[in-house]
């Protein structure tokens, strides 16, 4: 084995010289330089600095403007809540531990950080699935006369929380476990060991199948069908400039959604799966740290993609920030007026909200 396994930890370094210590008790500067830990701390501070205001603003603007309190926006708010879970439950803890060079908060702190980070990430992921399914049902109309109402939104919210808890809770109760990973200053699911009594193998397979592959397939199926529907509507009305504009806007949105999803989760999932299938092989501490920390950026670009691309929300946000006046109101109004009125696909049913 090219690492050192101990009670509730796995350090990716063989303890041939006797320098490896528990990441709960001692700084891990023998893995990488102190400057690397300082850089991680600064990175987490930047994510907090960006992630908290934009997600809090999302909640505040929606509460302040009654016209934003629509069923679909409940799911978007759920996405912001998930990101705030990650910011407060995960990012602040990771910044603090990075500044110390080890997981100074101990085993309990590791469980809490791993739980909140996983919960927030999973709520966000399944919220995107619900959004994708809603867009597919409304735009492609596999069920005639379907309207996404408040009851559907509540069921969608409940679904995201149930699925998130079904992934984040088991490691707390003995099906797998949370341990420090990478540079040992953040915690995640144990992909590294076959710890007796924790059934890590079955949980990791369950997690990848039910909480990565399935949601990814659903998202790309739904938005693939959405794109086809928009193209069909545009082809049926070749001379409609507004329909062509709708096609372009939706195409851009779909491409951004797909790329963001892959960029956020595929590196982390791929590295985690590699480590799981090559347990005992040699890999450095940075190997898992980089994709794990990069995946955390979803708390920043999730609201940018799924909320700030909403023209109505952007108008309300500017109004809130400018004390009740929108200096770009004329431009926003012209943009809103240009929304497509195509019978098959309207921009109100194609836009993110």
Swiss-Prot record:
Species of origin reads: Dicentrarchus labrax (European seabass)
Protein function: Photoreceptor required for image-forming vision at low light intensity. While most salt water fish species use retinal as chromophore, most freshwater fish use 3-dehydroretinal, or a mixture of retinal and 3-dehydroretinal. Light-induced isomerization of 11-cis to all-trans retinal triggers a conformational change that activates signaling via G-proteins. Subsequent receptor phosphorylation mediates displacement of the bound G-protein alpha subunit by arrestin and terminates signaling.
Q: Topological domain, Cytoplasmic: which ranges?
A: 62-73, 134-152, 225-252, 309-353
Extracellular-side stretches of the chain, per the record, are 1-36, 97-110, 174-202, 275-286
Gene transcribed to yield this protein: rho
Q: Does the keyword Phosphoprotein apply?
A: yes
The GO terms describing molecular function are: 11-cis retinal binding; G protein-coupled photoreceptor activity
Q: What is this protein called?
A: Rhodopsin
Cysteine disulfide links: 110-187
Bias (Low complexity): 334-353
What does the PTM comment state? Phosphorylated on some or all of the serine and threonine residues present in the C-terminal region.
